[in-house]
Amino acid sequence: MKALVILGLLFLSVAVQGKVFERCELARTLKKLGLDDYKGVSLANWLCLSKWESGYNTKATNYNPGSESTDYGIFQINSKWWCNDGKTPNAVDGCHVSCSALMENDIEKAVACAKHIVSEQGITAWVAWKSHCRVHDVSSYVEGCKL
């Protein structure tokens, strides 16, 4: 019985933590989902953005008290403009997706929303990209990934 309780707690902690991608695993996944050079944004830039936004963690969240909104998932997509979390005042839901869907281990919906965002606003919509990736050599993010 004690072993079942411990096993249950282990599974619960994995479910709450979500998937933290390895760098090259994420590179292959993003490439497969069509982000490599999407709207002129290189795969290395998407990896840099993901690293600085979420640490490659699908369950990452960040509350923004000023706008009463939350950033969700591997790309930290904001509930004020892009997804519906049911609690952000005057939310737009530009991607027509629930914010919880952006935190799934299968990142297909997060990628679809990221494509929508970059199509409308460009990669500069992400503050972390502007701060950590824009003027840097990001080639190391895909180095050795055998793409």
Swiss-Prot record:
The active site is at 53, 71. Keywords: Antimicrobial, Bacteriolytic enzyme, Digestion, Disulfide bond, Glycosidase, Hydrolase, Secreted, Signal. Disulfide bonds join 24-145, 48-133, 83-99, 95-113. GO terms for molecular function: lysozyme activity. It catalyses: Hydrolysis of (1->4)-beta-linkages between N-acetylmuramic acid and N-acetyl-D-glucosamine residues in a peptidoglycan and between N-acetyl-D-glucosamine residues in chitodextrins. GO terms for biological process: defense response to Gram-negative bacterium; defense response to Gram-positive bacterium; digestion; killing of cells of another organism. Residues 1-18 form the signal peptide. It is an enzyme of class 3 (hydrolase). Its EC number is 3.2.1.17. GO terms for cellular component: extracellular region. It is found in: Secreted. Residues 19-147 form the C-type lysozyme domain. Lysozymes have primarily a bacteriolytic function; those in tissues and body fluids are associated with the monocyte-macrophage system and enhance the activity of immunoagents. Belongs to the glycosyl hydrolase 22 family. Monomer. Lysozyme C is capable of both hydrolysis and transglycosylation; it also shows a slight esterase activity. It acts rapidly on both peptide-substituted and unsubstituted peptidoglycan, and slowly on chitin oligosaccharides. This is Lysozyme C-3. It comes from Ovis aries (Sheep).
